[in-house]
Amino acid sequence: MEPLCNASEPPLRPEARSSGNGDLQFLGWNVPPDQIQYIPEHWLTQLEPPASMHYMLGVFYIFLFCASTVGNGMVIWIFSTSKSLRTPSNMFVLNLAVFDLIMCLKAPIFIYNSFHRGFALGNTWCQIFASIGSYSGIGAGMTNAAIGYDRYNVITKPMNRNMTFTKAVIMNIIIWLYCTPWVVLPLTQFWDRFVPEGYLTSCSFDYLSDNFDTRLFVGTIFFFSFVCPTLMILYYYSQIVGHVFSHEKALREQAKKMNVESLRSNVDKSKETAEIRIAKAAITICFLFFVSWTPYGVMSLIGAFGDKSLLTPGATMIPACTCKLVACIDPFVYAISHPRYRLELQKRCPWLGVNEKSGEISSAQSTTTQEQQQTTAA
């Protein structure tokens, strides 16, 4: 008779070891008995995916880890050391890059689990993985809202720039404090808990337990970590778009009355171009946040309030991947759209082939000086 497990391998959970068809196994087949208790029963009834799926996701996360580390590392390096970029507004960009970098720091846990086909690192590393994900995900969303607020003030109220370094730092601290309860509560199991999900290679808050507390937690965290920042982002950028269109319309009408082609001077055009490019970068990043986190939010709502049978391991890994992908893309959006960042990137890394004309952002440079003088005075 064949033994249930090899002496050199962890003991298998007998009821999860095989589906009865000989070749098929359930998720959790290679999890030690003392770790099974941490896995929601929903996943233990799902079939184990092919090993190739684990390996493919592991390779994909290696790519994300490398791209995000390099991209966000460069953003943090350049924004924190460049005098022209050291402005109160860019404190939010720096904070977003820090959250995105933190997001990618949990990738090695996922990669290790993937190449070991499951819950290999156990519950302790699962708690670390989920804590990092909660901090970075919620923090990125609220920072995007703060960026929207700042862009809203800069573009719609150009004569009332009241953002100072002190205010920016305080807002960033508030963002970190805002994230803390959503990490501490499930981490201490005071309200909900962190558990494995999908292929058991990643972890998040429990959205599958069929009880009132879990449903209340899912609904609450969905509102405060996704709905609130999304509504703020939509409001600020809708105001920006409305202001830009109405401003352009007013200028065209006035120019028509005066029989001139345009009322803008070259300096005004340059300044407007720089501001609009920065706004476009911010809008793009906020759009990416919405697109990448919406699937995960919908998935958690289905788990708590809907038909759990829809949540197959493969289906849940897609939202888990999309919300990590945005942390990789954010820095490259700035590399494409942020004029002063592109100029610094061109100076420090000429081999990247970035082509940014300093004349196009001269007004932005003077704006930076003005902001710094206002900050010093404050």
From Swiss-Prot:
Annotated membrane topology: Multi-pass membrane protein
InterPro entries: GPCR_opsins, GPCR_Rhodpsn, GPCR_Rhodpsn_7TM, Opsin, Retinal_BS
Sugar-modified residues: 6
Cytoplasmic side: 79-90, 149-167, 245-280, 338-378
Subcellular compartments: Membrane
Sections of the chain in a coiled coil: none
Molecular function per GO: G protein-coupled photoreceptor activity
Main localization, broad class: membrane
Disulfide cross-links: 126-203
UniProt entry keywords in alphabetical sequence: Chromophore, Disulfide bond, G-protein coupled receptor, Glycoprotein, Membrane, Phosphoprotein, Photoreceptor protein, Receptor, Retinal protein, Sensory transduction, Transducer, Transmembrane, Transmembrane helix, Vision
Biological process terms in GO annotation: cellular response to light stimulus; detection of UV; G protein-coupled receptor signaling pathway; phototransduction; phototransduction, UV; visual perception
Residues with PTM N6-(retinylidene)lysine: 324
Topological domains annotated Extracellular: 1-53, 112-127, 193-216, 305-312
Membrane-spanning intervals of the chain: 54-78, 91-111, 128-148, 168-192, 217-244, 281-304, 313-337
Gene Ontology cellular-component annotations: membrane; plasma membrane
PTM field: Phosphorylated on some or all of the serine and threonine residues present in the C-terminal region.
Note: Each Drosophila eye is composed of 800 facets or ommatidia. Each ommatidium contains 8 photoreceptor cells (R1-R8), the R1 to R6 cells are outer cells, while R7 and R8 are inner cells.
Function: Visual pigments are the light-absorbing molecules that mediate vision. They consist of an apoprotein, opsin, covalently linked to cis-retinal.
Similarity-based family: Belongs to the G-protein coupled receptor 1 family. Opsin subfamily.
Protein name per UniProt: Opsin Rh4
Annotated source species: Drosophila melanogaster
Phylogenetic placement of the source organism: Eukaryota, Metazoa, Ecdysozoa, Arthropoda, Hexapoda
